[in-house]
């Protein structure tokens, strides 16, 4: 009987509260690495800018950072100054101050033109901006596609703990 209770508790936790999710690829580098195992908080459905979220996309789970919130306008500006690339993310026409991007953005994708987010739409990007399939390529994501937030790394154990 006690095994049944334990199994039931574990199933309920995984279905409703939290579940492990594995990072597939380097799109969130340097924040996260390929094969890191994170805790996805399924109960957290209020999303803020810069939250790291888990998204269901077709048969995959994507781990990305929220850049644009419902109702906002997003645009990525890229200019070349000599051999240097200067990129800016604009939210409602204002430069977004953030330091999550690993390097300057080389491709704006669909965000080369302004994108007006709907009432339940989010614009997400990987921190490794030049090695990420995100909203610039895949389009915006609806709230129902975002399964939860994550801010805790389980494995590898040497990196266990909270991340931003």
Question: Which positions does each model-derived feature cover?
Answer:
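N-terminal Sec-pathway targeting helices
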Residues: 1-7
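Soluble "head" domains of membrane/secretory-pathway proteins
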Residues: 4, 16, 29-164
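Hydrophobic alpha-helical segments, principally membrane-spanning helices and signal/leader peptides
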Residues: 9-10, 127
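Aromatic-capped interface at the extracytoplasmic side
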Residues: 11-29
